[in-house]
């Protein structure tokens, strides 16, 4: 029972912060959350992730819907796009510094959650 209570308290705390952070945006749908995990995984492993690769990796999400979610994440300041010097058409998606800090805090909180 304590595990369930801890998880519930964690979730409620996260949702209270939703108007001030990325919590609400990335919990809108499984696709939003999956996108966050894909971008952050690439970032943490120092891998390049192109917008096209991200669209392909998002399961059960159409390419137009993926493009909309990516655009929203960029507009809200969670991610930014970088062009390569070799091919100006290819854009890599990267988290902003502020989002990296938010994500790191989220992971620390999850790790400290005693289940």
Locations of the language-model features?
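Short alpha-helical segments that sit at the start of domains
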Residues: 9-38
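Short acidic, hydrophobic short linear motifs in intrinsically disordered regions
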Residues: 45-57
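Short, cationic-aromatic polyanion-contact patches
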Residues: 84-107
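A short, conserved structural fragment
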Residues: 74-84
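Short helix-to-turn junction characteristic of helix-turn-helix DNA-binding domains
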Residues: 39-43
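Amphipathic alpha-helical dimerization/coiled-coil segments
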Residues: 18, 104-115
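Short amphipathic alpha-helical interaction segments
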Residues: 60-75
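Phosphate-/nucleic-acid-contacting segments
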Residues: 52, 59-63, 87-91
């Amino acid at each position: 029972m304590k595990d369930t209570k801890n998880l519930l308290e964690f979730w409620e705390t996260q949702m209270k912060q939703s108007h001030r952070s990325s919590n609400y945006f990335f919990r809108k749908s499984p696709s939003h959350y999956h996108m966050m995990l894909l971008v952050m995984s690439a970032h943490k492993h120092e891998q390049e992730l192109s917008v096209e690769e991200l669209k392909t990796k998002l399961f059960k999400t159409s390419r137009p819907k993926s493009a909309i979610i990516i655009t929203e994440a960029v507009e809200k300041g969670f991610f930014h796009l970088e062009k390569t010097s070799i091919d100006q058409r290819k854009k890599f998606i990267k988290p902003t510094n502020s989002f990296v800090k938010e994500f790191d805090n989220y992971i620390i909180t999850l790790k400290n959650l005693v289940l």
